[in-house]
Amino acid sequence: MSEELTLQLIDLHAGGDVSRIVTGGIDPLPGNTVREKMEYLREDADGLRQLLLSEPYGIPEMSVDLLVPASDPEAEVGYIIMEVMGYPIYSGSNTICTATAVLESGLVPKREGHQRFILESAAGLVHIEARVENGVVEAITCEGLPSYIDTYRASIHVPSVGDVTYSVAYSGGFYAMVDAAELGFSLNRDEEARLAECAHAIVEAIQAERGFSHYTLGDVGPLPFLHFMGPVEQVADGFFRSRSTTYVHPGVICRSTTGTGTSARLALMHHEGTLQPGDKLETVSLRGTGFIGEFTGSRQEGDHRVAENTITGKAHMLARSDIVINCNDPLVECGSLHHILTSGHRRTEALPVEEEVSLSD
């Protein structure tokens, strides 16, 4: 009888984007930091990402977050983000889902009211504030990465689209920021397929023309994201709202507006001088879901004025499950995965033994 290989998952969604939190079934990864463990997965064990984001186990529109031990003693746990485009060092929606999962699993004890704790992403420490009411995690507020404008109102000719004006923001990944109305979109759900086609063409054109380098991280690869911006409506003093849509290359229109997309929009509004510290922006997706970003201040980093911000959203629990991996299945590719799998339901070292029962219930 062949050995049974399994992964333990908690599935949640934030704004419609599903995050699959891997809580067990993976051996300890090489690397002294979360960033080094992420790089090991990317270079030597990309099969985990491919497995859970491909049929028959998943689809590219999902994300995966692997819990790993934190390297910083301030953090409760580390997490590695995986998406269709690869390994972003940060994501707001994935952070909201991961923070909710560690509370719902008991890894971080849940308390009524407001509580704070720290997670460790590949980008560094992330401060979390959770709001718990009647035992339910009603909201997670997490730090957005310091965000800035790399390019403001450049122009490019895109075959099948025409001349496109775009800005580029960094908020955990580089985003092309485009005005939806200028491209003929109202940001309604029935436009989803055309939005994906348009974004694909624009991103391909920008990637072919130029690359982008972060002021401390250096080359972080080709531009992976595009954010369609609707008009901004002021709904109260210091509170704004805008329909928005985020595209992830290749081919994915996000269900939510995304946390990093919201941070990128805050950076652009700050660059244009329309925000004051404490101002908030609610981005609203094609499905009517939203995140609230708050501009908390700015500082100079080299040649860039970075916008500090927080993102608030709610994650909804979907499932706790054991995924059975059969490497004899012709639809399952285990070549870049088998060497990190643990047999027999053993938890990853990120999770204490005493939490095993509550996580597998």
UniProtKB/Swiss-Prot annotation:
<comment type="similarity">
    <text>Belongs to the proline racemase family.</text>
</comment>
<feature type="binding site">
    <location>
        <begin position="92"/>
        <end position="93"/>
    </location>
    <ligand>
        <name>substrate</name>
    </ligand>
</feature>
<dbReference type="Pfam" id="PF05544">
    <property type="entry name" value="Pro_racemase"/>
</dbReference>
<feature type="active site" description="Proton acceptor">
    <location>
        <position position="91"/>
    </location>
</feature>
<protein>
    <recommendedName>
        <fullName>Protein Csal_2339</fullName>
        <ecNumber>5.1.1.8</ecNumber>
    </recommendedName>
</protein>
<feature type="binding site">
    <location>
        <begin position="259"/>
        <end position="260"/>
    </location>
    <ligand>
        <name>substrate</name>
    </ligand>
</feature>
<dbReference type="InterPro" id="IPR008794">
    <property type="entry name" value="Pro_racemase_fam"/>
</dbReference>
<dbReference type="GO" id="GO:0047580">
    <property type="term" value="F:4-hydroxyproline epimerase activity"/>
</dbReference>
<comment type="function">
    <text>In vitro, catalyzes the epimerization of trans-4-hydroxy-L-proline (t4LHyp) to cis-4-hydroxy-D-proline (c4DHyp), albeit with very low efficiency. The physiological substrate may be different. Displays neither proline racemase activity nor t3LHyp dehydratase activity.</text>
</comment>
<keyword id="KW-0413">Isomerase</keyword>
